[in-house]
Amino acid sequence: MTKLRPSSRGGIEVRLLLDTAALIFAVESPENLSTRAKAVLQNPQNTLELSAISLVEIAIKSALGKLRLSAEDARRAVDELGVRILPYTSKHAFHLFELPLHHRDPFDRQIIAQALVEKIPIATPDDKFSLYKGLKIIW
């Protein structure tokens, strides 16, 4: 269920967790975002969030040469999109024990656990996320 709350600007405000791919698409290739994802990202009433795990994933994959996104690029993307960094806690980590193994990517599994614990929808182009019961996907 999408977590809704009254907006200080009037109306309904939606929290949305961007997965790493959604952030990269938003920055490097917005044409790869779905129409729905673009609309949600561009709505100023929505609160966009990024897992701290996504920053870890970007740093590791950049160091391994799998991504061409520097720390400065990531910082700029977060600032330009007005994204709030969602800290990763032990509550999120313990939820990993309950997740079925539909997905072997450790970064994605941590982000999925975080979205489930926080009860917020996630923006992702990854079809495997839909295998997780209770996870609301915006794409």
PLM features: what roles do these ranges have?
Residues 1-50, 64-76, 80, 118, ...:
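Short, well-structured N-terminal submotif of metal-dependent ribonuclease cores
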Residues 134-138:
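Basic, glycine-rich
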Residues 11, 66, 71, 80-125:
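Active-site neighborhoods of divalent-metal-dependent phosphate/nucleic-acid chemistry enzymes
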Residues 22, 54-55, 92, 111, ...:
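Alpha-helix capping/helix-boundary segments
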Residues 58:
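Phosphate/NTP-binding elements of NTP-utilizing enzymes
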